[in-house]
């Protein structure tokens, strides 16, 4: 591809209605874009392909929750404390910058995970200046990326626009577990808007302040080492870029199957499964194998909730390797935190192979009440969640977490009870595949773009407009017939563009530019025998078919069940 491929794609995207800067008549704002008619159709098809994999094939449940959540949710999840980026600004022009990204761009170093103090030292050591005006950069501070607001008038309850869709799933775990017949593993998905007040978004649609996430939260028993259906994607060959290779001076990507990566201990079965699934999905969208890799997060860049995380990255001409999917092992972090903060028991239950003796603290409310007042019920609930295999573990007092604070509970506030149990409660672990739909959409545009012809060559099923319908000439009889064909195809469920403006060659060129895979032309012969021609975008070859068979033929072509050469009589 040529160096200006991003500009070429975005010029077509703006001109033809894929992607538009938002608020243009008021000067726009970084990090916000609109999808035009073609972009909205393309985005919907990407989302439906994602649903095909996760809802239909995996059988996961889908929910829809509010975009605005109460503050307690994010205090429990750790986002209020940890969802921060390092920020600096120019003391002269006032422009703001994300400090680690600025250091990486200007110095070519890896600044991910550096503390504000370390970044401050780096900036001063190399005398980094404002890239906009050359002014001096101010102190590096921490900036929370969540948009906050008040819920209700005056000083209402604090709320946040969600920075991820996941939290609503975790806080509904009790009902979701019940709907899953209390069996693990099970998955829950959500597609929706997420919001991050990025400090200085400068990469077009790659870094947005409002974007669409498609996330799955897959709950499983950590004692079960095998993931059901693992064989489905076990033989997918991926390019792995683990931590060890990243830390080498000349580290390399390791090409191997998901099965081999699991056998070598590089990834767990659940993570490997979803890496393989994601690669296959991206292939279906026209992203080639050589442009896809799976990179493991370094410890310093890992999110506060993750024990391991792998990004599926796609190679782009301007931006290099860009994360489009993150697959994180969130362990039991979220369920445990929400249990501690809410007082609700968000555990699952497993049967034991043999009964066993356990010891647990039974709260003594007449001691807890006077000592802890209004916190006593939550402390009692936290005590009831504790079990031990020996009585000695519970003697001498206990420490529990309530509302994010550790509370020391003296031994007189509980009695030690011995029980014989046939099962036990535990916090399920969670694997989270999180897809950035907007980034995937741009990757689809770039990797299906033909720079020589200046057209998009989407897979037929993915094209926003599936069929163009044209009269050969702008004669009333041909126009009327072509409009009837277009209406019939729309009623059959196809996305159709009717066009009778300009020469037939110009109409084909306009359709090719936006990736229309098949164009139907009504000509003189149509008026005589009710046949039309179908033109293939990529070969420009044409076949003639009967109008009565047109919908079935097009459906076979778009679904990949019919070869073009077999679709009709060659013209």
UniProtKB/Swiss-Prot annotation:
Source organism superkingdom: Archaea
Pfam families xref list: HGTP_anticodon, tRNA-synt_2b
Keyword ATP-binding found: yes
Nucleotide-binding among keywords: yes
Residues annotated to bind substrate: 98, 164, 211-215, 432-436
GO biological process: glycyl-tRNA aminoacylation
Primary location recorded for the protein, binned into one broad class: cytoplasm
Documented EC number(s): 6.1.1.14
GO CC aspect terms: cytoplasm
Any GO MF annotation of the entry: glycine-tRNA ligase activity
CDD domains: GlyRS-like_core, GlyRS_anticodon
Catalytic activity line of the entry: tRNA(Gly) + glycine + ATP = glycyl-tRNA(Gly) + AMP + diphosphate
Similarity comment text for this entry: Belongs to the class-II aminoacyl-tRNA synthetase family.
Function: Catalyzes the attachment of glycine to tRNA(Gly).
Protein name, as recorded: Glycine--tRNA ligase
Organism: Methanopyrus kandleri (strain AV19 / DSM 6324 / JCM 9639 / NBRC 100938)
Gene name tied to this protein: glyS
